[in-house]
Protein backbone atom coordinates (compact mmCIF):
# COMPACT_ATOMS: atom_id res chain seq x y z
CA UNK A 1 0.00 0.00 0.00
CA UNK A 2 1.20 3.48 -0.83
CA UNK A 3 1.48 6.14 1.84
CA UNK A 4 -1.24 8.73 1.93
CA UNK A 5 -0.11 12.16 0.84
CA UNK A 6 0.27 14.60 3.70
CA UNK A 7 -1.01 18.05 2.88
CA UNK A 8 1.28 20.89 3.81
CA UNK A 9 -0.42 24.14 4.75
CA UNK A 10 0.38 27.12 2.56
CA UNK A 11 2.70 29.63 4.19
CA UNK A 12 0.90 32.76 5.34
CA UNK A 13 1.40 35.90 3.31
CA UNK A 14 3.15 38.70 5.14
CA UNK A 15 0.48 41.42 5.56
CA UNK A 16 3.09 44.17 5.82
CA UNK A 17 4.67 43.30 2.48
CA UNK A 18 1.24 42.94 0.88
CA UNK A 19 0.30 46.46 2.07
CA UNK A 20 3.76 47.75 1.01
CA UNK A 21 4.59 48.98 4.52
CA UNK A 22 8.26 49.85 4.97
CA UNK A 23 8.19 51.43 8.43
CA UNK A 24 6.04 50.58 11.44
CA UNK A 25 4.98 53.75 13.24
CA UNK A 26 3.08 53.99 16.52
CA UNK A 27 0.93 56.79 15.06
CA UNK A 28 -0.42 54.51 12.30
CA UNK A 29 -3.37 53.26 14.35
CA UNK A 30 -5.22 51.72 11.39
CA UNK A 31 -2.29 49.39 10.69
CA UNK A 32 -1.72 48.52 14.35
CA UNK A 33 -5.38 47.58 14.88
CA UNK A 34 -4.91 44.68 12.44
CA UNK A 35 -2.48 43.14 14.92
CA UNK A 36 -4.71 43.49 18.00
CA UNK A 37 -7.48 41.05 18.94
CA UNK A 38 -10.98 42.16 19.87
CA UNK A 39 -9.96 41.67 23.51
CA UNK A 40 -7.08 44.12 23.09
CA UNK A 41 -4.28 41.54 23.06
CA UNK A 42 -1.40 41.62 20.61
CA UNK A 43 -1.87 38.81 18.10
CA UNK A 44 0.79 36.09 17.89
CA UNK A 45 3.26 35.81 15.03
CA UNK A 46 1.84 32.49 13.89
CA UNK A 47 -1.57 34.15 13.52
CA UNK A 48 -0.45 37.30 11.70
CA UNK A 49 2.32 35.79 9.57
CA UNK A 50 4.97 38.47 10.14
CA UNK A 51 8.68 37.89 10.77
CA UNK A 52 10.31 37.90 14.21
CA UNK A 53 11.83 41.34 13.76
CA UNK A 54 8.56 42.80 12.46
CA UNK A 55 6.62 41.27 15.36
CA UNK A 56 8.97 42.97 17.85
CA UNK A 57 8.55 46.32 16.09
CA UNK A 58 4.76 45.91 15.97
CA UNK A 59 4.60 45.01 19.67
CA UNK A 60 6.74 48.01 20.62
CA UNK A 61 4.66 50.34 18.41
CA UNK A 62 1.42 49.05 19.98
CA UNK A 63 2.83 49.61 23.47
CA UNK A 64 3.91 53.15 22.54
CA UNK A 65 0.49 53.89 21.01
CA UNK A 66 -1.20 52.67 24.19
CA UNK A 67 1.07 54.86 26.30
CA UNK A 68 0.03 58.02 24.42
CA UNK A 69 -3.65 56.92 24.40
CA UNK A 70 -3.96 56.24 20.67
CA UNK A 71 -4.94 52.62 21.39
CA UNK A 72 -6.81 51.21 24.39
CA UNK A 73 -5.10 48.86 26.83
CA UNK A 74 -8.10 46.53 26.76
CA UNK A 75 -10.72 45.58 24.19
CA UNK A 76 -14.08 47.21 23.57
CA UNK A 77 -15.49 45.89 26.84
CA UNK A 78 -18.98 44.63 27.44
Curated annotation (Swiss-Prot):
Report a single Gene Ontology molecular function.
small ribosomal subunit rRNA binding
Instruction: Report keywords, A-Z.
Output: Ribonucleoprotein, Ribosomal protein, RNA-binding, rRNA-binding
Q: Could you give one GO CC term from the UniProt record?
A: cytosolic small ribosomal subunit
InterPro entries the record matches: Ribosomal_bS18 (IPR001648), Ribosomal_bS18_CS (IPR018275), Ribosomal_bS18_sf (IPR036870)
Q: Does the keyword Ribonucleoprotein apply?
A: yes
Gene3D superfamilies reported in the protein's UniProt record: Ribosomal protein S18
Offer one example of a GO biological process linked to this entry. translation
The UniProt subunit note reads as follows: Part of the 30S ribosomal subunit. Forms a tight heterodimer with protein bS6.
* Purpose of the protein: Binds as a heterodimer with protein bS6 to the central domain of the 16S rRNA, where it helps stabilize the platform of the 30S subunit.
Family assignment from sequence similarity? Belongs to the bacterial ribosomal protein bS18 family.
Protein name in UniProt: Small ribosomal subunit protein bS18
Q: Which organism is it from?
A: Kocuria rhizophila (strain ATCC 9341 / DSM 348 / NBRC 103217 / DC2201)
The encoding gene: rpsR
Amino acid sequence: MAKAEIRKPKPKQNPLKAADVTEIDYKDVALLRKFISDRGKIRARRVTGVSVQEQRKIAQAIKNAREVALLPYSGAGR
